[in-house]
């Protein structure tokens, strides 16, 4: 659920609107390998490590836009946000969608913007990947 919390953080930072241009738990690349025809930002997480009460997830922020210049600027803004501002957060929350908080956040830097897929018209799905260490709020697990 840290992907939802990241999605809410991106909404609060002005990157889009949840459910319209910001999505979590789905992918712009379909199981057939084809690409969705929607524009927007997708956030997904995979747990890569657990050490006691400390979790490490890899977050993927993907985008697909018809305008490649708009997409390029967006990805640069996202990269700058992840590497220069996200580390200032000590808590990420899923509110108001779900009452789940992630505390003691530590963000590892993102190092690249990757191309994940190309649609039938040559438009790209691009992604930024980075790791986040966190603990669950005690209220979340009760």
Language-model segments: which ranges?
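Short, solvent-exposed beta-alpha or beta-beta edge segments that form flexible loop/patches at the rim
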Residues: 17-70, 108-121, 127, 136-138
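Generic alpha-helical propensity signal that fires on short helical segments
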Residues: 59-61, 77-81, 142
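Acidic-leaning, charged glycine-interspersed low-complexity segments
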Residues: 84-131
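Extracellular/virion structural assembly segments
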Residues: 65-94
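Short N-terminal helix-initiation segments at or just after the protein's N-terminus
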Residues: 1-8, 66-77, 131-142
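Small/polar-rich, solvent-exposed N-terminal microdomains that initiate assembly or binding
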Residues: 1-52, 85-103, 141-142
């Amino acid at each position: 659920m840290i992907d939802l919390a990241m999605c809410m953080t991106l909404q609060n930072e002005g990157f889009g609107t949840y459910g319209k241009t910001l999505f979590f738990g789905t992918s712009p690349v379909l199981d057939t390998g084809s690409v969705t025809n929607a524009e927007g930002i997708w956030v997904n997480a995979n747990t890569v490590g657990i050490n006691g009460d400390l979790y490490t997830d890899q977050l993927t922020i993907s985008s697909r836009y018809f305008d490649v210049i708009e997409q390029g600027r967006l990805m640069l803004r996202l990269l700058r946000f992840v590497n220069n501002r996200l580390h200032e957060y000590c808590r990420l929350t899923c509110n108001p969608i779900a009452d789940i908080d992630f505390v003691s956040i530590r963000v590892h830097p993102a190092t690249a913007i990757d191309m994940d897929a190309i649609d039938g018209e040559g438009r790209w799905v691009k992604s930024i990947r980075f790791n986040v260490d966190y603990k669950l709020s005690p209220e979340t697990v009760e």
